């Protein structure tokens, strides 16, 4: 079946849908209503009218691959999963990529990268949604799909990922006026707050929660303290810091921080301290697109990325904020710095030629002795 909701279109969409319904070989329900101001309302209307075993939310700008629904339903039926992600490709716009490395017949939100795709364009088992009375939050003007999809991931009995077939074509509008790009900065904080609260409600404090909290901190909150922050006036800066502080106080942990790059961790920490001045200095440095100096302590052999205010006696910033983690890859002079993917903080320096090389501190002495070629952190 197709349930098409015309949310107050003024371009003849309603008439086109009704004409399509008359000649369609499958059941088509057309609902015409006044414009609701966002996607949540029409999605909820369509969801309540749906009667199939599965539902899929298709946005007006986009389209499906010819075999998309067939393949996704078959995947869910074969493996008994409640949510299926079909590979998304961008048309005149970018699309998420990191979760499409390989097809996963059965996974979950904790052991995959699906937390980085929270749009509503997934196949959902309708029984999952009705059993938990799941609907889109119409009070949110942005990020409502992230809240809905994350809840589905957390409640699902398994999630499947189809990576070997282009299921969904995410089409960029020529005018750039996508609903998800509208609204002021306060709406982004509303979205981050709601998503963090949902995760905290469903997942006890610990490594699993920290792993999920990376998503709202990195994708929703942190952009507010990116390049746009330098353009904000003082009043907006103060407001953003005030909005962020309760979330940082409640959900920002060392476990979340250790999963972010140094510059990301610095920005969140400085926002939590309310230090717009120090944050601006870091952003000015990032704007120059230069790699930070690599500082290796000659005594402890600990390594740091020396962003602005590293060991600045006038700034209350601990050295630990500057320690690189496994997400960090920085090219420094003739070296490519790439910490191993390990839980502990450790890294090596590998020159472009491939042979191990020492870390040399400012004093000029090798940072390792004998055969130990790793600067320990």
Q: Where in the sequence are the language-model features?
A:
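Nucleotide-sugar donor-binding/catalytic module of glycosyltransferases
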Residues: 1-191, 229, 340, 346-347
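A short, terminal or domain-edge coil/loop segment
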Residues: 85-88, 136-147, 194-198, 217-228, ...
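Short, solvent-exposed segments of well-ordered alpha helices
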Residues: 186, 212, 333-336
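Solvent-exposed aromatic/hydrophobic patches embedded in short alpha-helical segments
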Residues: 51, 123-124, 213-226
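Generic structural hydrophobic/aromatic packing signal, biased to beta-strands
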Residues: 61, 84, 124, 170, ...
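All-alpha amphipathic helical-bundle segments outside canonical DNA-binding/catalytic cores
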Residues: 206-214
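Catalytic core of nucleotide-sugar-dependent glycosyltransferases
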Residues: 165-173, 179-207, 220-224, 230-251
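Basic, ligand-binding patches in group-transfer machinery
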Residues: 230-377
């Amino acid at each position: 079946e197709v349930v098409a909701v015309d949310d107050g279109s003024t371009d003849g969409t309603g008439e086109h849908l009704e004409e399509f319904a008359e000649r369609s070989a499958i059941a088509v329900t057309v609902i015409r209503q006044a414009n609701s101001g966002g996607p949540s309302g029409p999605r909820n209307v369509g969801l309540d009218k749906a009667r199939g075993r599965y539902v899929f939310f298709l946005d007006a700008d986009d389209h499906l691959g010819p075999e998309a629904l067939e393949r996704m339903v078959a995947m869910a039926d074969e493996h008994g999963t409640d949510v299926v992600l079909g590979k998304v490709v961008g048309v005149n716009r970018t699309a998420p990529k990191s979760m499409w490395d390989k097809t996963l017949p059965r996974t979950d939100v904790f052991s995959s990268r699906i937390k980085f795709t929270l749009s509503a364009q997934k196949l959902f088992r309708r029984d999952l949604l009705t059993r938990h009375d799941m609907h889109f939050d119409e009070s949110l003007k942005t990020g409502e799909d992230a809240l809905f999809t994350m809840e589905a991931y957390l409640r699902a009995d398994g999630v499947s990922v189809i990576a070997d077939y282009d299921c969904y074509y995410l089409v960029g509008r020529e005018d750039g006026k996508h609903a998800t790009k509208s609204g002021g900065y306060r709406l982004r904080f509303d979205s981050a707050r709601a998503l963090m609260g949902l995760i905290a409600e469903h997942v006890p404090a610990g490594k699993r929660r920290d792993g999920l909290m990376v998503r709202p901190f990195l994708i929703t909150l942190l952009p507010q303290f990116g390049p746009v922050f330098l353009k904000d006036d003082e009043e907006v800066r103060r407001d953003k810091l005030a909005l962020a502080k309760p979330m940082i106080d409640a959900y920002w942990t060392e476990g979340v921080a250790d999963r972010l790059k140094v510059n990301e961790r610095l920005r969140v920490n400085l926002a939590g301290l309310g230090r717009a001045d120090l944050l601006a200095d870091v952003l000015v440095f990032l704007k120059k697109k230069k790699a930070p100096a690599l500082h290796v302590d000659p005594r402890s052999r600990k390594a740091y990325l020396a962003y602005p205010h590293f060991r600045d006696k006038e700034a209350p910033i601990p050295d630990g904020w500057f320690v690189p983690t496994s997400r960090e890859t920085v090219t420094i002079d003739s070296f490519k710095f790439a910490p191993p993917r390990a839980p502990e903080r450790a890294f090596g320096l590998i020159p472009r030629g491939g042979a191990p090389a020492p870390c040399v501190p400012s004093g000029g002495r090798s940072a390792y002795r004998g055969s130990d070629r790793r600067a320990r952190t």
